[in-house]
C-alpha cells in the first residue's frame, strides 16, 4: 500500500478493479487480510452468511488498520514516495549502466528491482555482509524495497 506512489498500484493505470485483496501493508506488521469488491459485484455474488471468517471483526486488528490508514493520509506517504522514488530509479539505472551483468531496472515507486544475467543469491549475501539488505525476486532479480518513510 502506497509503495508505488499511489495507495494501490491499479491507480496508475486508469482502471478500477471489481475485486481486490489487501493484507500485509494494511496492518503494518499486525496480521490482517481484506477482500474488497464493488457493491455491484457483491450484490450479484454474496448473500448474508456466504462469506465468513474465524478472526473477522477483531477489534485490535481493526484499530491497527484504522491507525495505518490514518498515518498514510496524515503523513502524506504516497506524496513522499513520489518525491523520493526518482532518486532510487536514478541510482539503479546508474548501476545497470555501469555493470554488464545487470540488464534492466524494473518496477515503480519504492518497489524496484534489477535484472541480472545470472542467479543473484551470492550478490544478496555479499550486500548483506556490507550492511545492505536486498532480497531476491526469483533467481535473477535483486529487489529494492526501502522504507516508505
Write out the residue ranges for each language-model feature.
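Conserved N-terminal phosphate-binding loop of PLP-dependent enzymes in the Aspartate aminotransferase
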Residues: 1-149
Amino acid at each position: 500500500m502506497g509503495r508505488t506512489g499511489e495507495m494501490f498500484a491499479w491507480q496508475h493505470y486508469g482502471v478500477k478493479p471489481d475485486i481486490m485483496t489487501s493484507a500485509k501493508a494494511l496492518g503494518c506488521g499486525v496480521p490482517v487480510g481484506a477482500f474488497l469488491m464493488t457493491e455491484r459485484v457483491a450484490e450479484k455474488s454474496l448473500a448474508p452468511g456466504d462469506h465468513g471468517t474465524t478472526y473477522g471483526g477483531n477489534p485490535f486488528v481493526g484499530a491497527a488498520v484504522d491507525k495505518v490508514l490514518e498515518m498514510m493520509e496524515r503523513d502524506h506517504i504516497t506524496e513522499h514516495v513520489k518525491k523520493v522514488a526518482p532518486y532510487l530509479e536514478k541510482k539503479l539505472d546508474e548501476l545497470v549502466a555501469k555493470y554488464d551483468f545487470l540488464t534492466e531496472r524494473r518496477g515503480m515507486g519504492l518497489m524496484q528491482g534489477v535484472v541480472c544475467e545470472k542467479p543473484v543469491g551470492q550478490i544478496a549475501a555479499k550486500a548483506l555482509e556490507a550492511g545492505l539488505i536486498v532480497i531476491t525476486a526469483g533467481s535473477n532479480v535483486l529487489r529494492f524495497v526501502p522504507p516508505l518513510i
